[in-house]
Amino acid sequence: MKQILDFIPLIIFFALYKMYDIYVATGALIVATAVQLIVTYALYKKVEKMQLITFVIVTIFGSMTIFFHDDNFIKWKVTIIYVVLAVGLTASHLMGKSVVKGMLGKEITLPDAIWAKINWAWVGFFSFFAGLNIYIAYELPLDVWVNFKVFGMLIATFAYMIATGVYIYKHMPKEEKNNSSDVSVDD
């Protein structure tokens, strides 16, 4: 349910962009992100830090897009969020902590060197897509950027998550691999 909530603002943005324009879609994105935050808090009694950061960035850059009637601001939002993620992962690693390990380390046992590689791989992913977003935003038409933002980045993120899962599975201790592949069927 929580993952579905994360995609609702994106779906609303895309639908309203196709029906109206970037400014209506941006206004709806701000409202949908605020509603998402409220619903998340109502259901789970907490809001993740990244959701809050995303809301602030969406609100600031979305408002600037509408106020100045300039779609460049909303185009920058994606890059800024990805830069924040890359910097956050880098800073946490330099402080001796791994955000990825913190999220998954309770369920999965891996050597710290593997967690570090996964962390750096995601830093690379976010950095690459931050730059690619700017390139597409300024070198290609707005329709291409919207499709890239909604579909390209979504598909790339899912694919990278799957690749990360495969990499993790490859480096899991044998006991955990056996436990994760055991399926008990009761007659």
Curated annotation (Swiss-Prot):
Primary subcellular site in the record, as a coarse category: membrane
Signal peptide extent: none
Keywords, ordered alphabetically: Cell inner membrane, Cell membrane, Membrane, Transmembrane, Transmembrane helix
Superkingdom to which the source organism belongs: Bacteria
Transmembrane segments: 22-42, 50-70, 80-100, 118-138, 148-168
Gene Ontology cellular component terms for the protein in this record: plasma membrane
Pfam families documented for this protein: IspA
Topological category with respect to the lipid bilayer: Multi-pass membrane protein
Location within or outside the cell: Cell inner membrane
Function of the molecule: Plays a role in cell envelope biogenesis, maintenance of cell envelope integrity and membrane homeostasis.
Family named by the database record: Belongs to the YciB family.
PANTHER family hit by this protein: INNER MEMBRANE-SPANNING PROTEIN YCIB (PTHR36917:SF1), INTRACELLULAR SEPTATION PROTEIN A-RELATED (PTHR36917)
Name of the protein: Inner membrane-spanning protein YciB
Protein source organism: Vibrio parahaemolyticus serotype O3:K6 (strain RIMD 2210633)
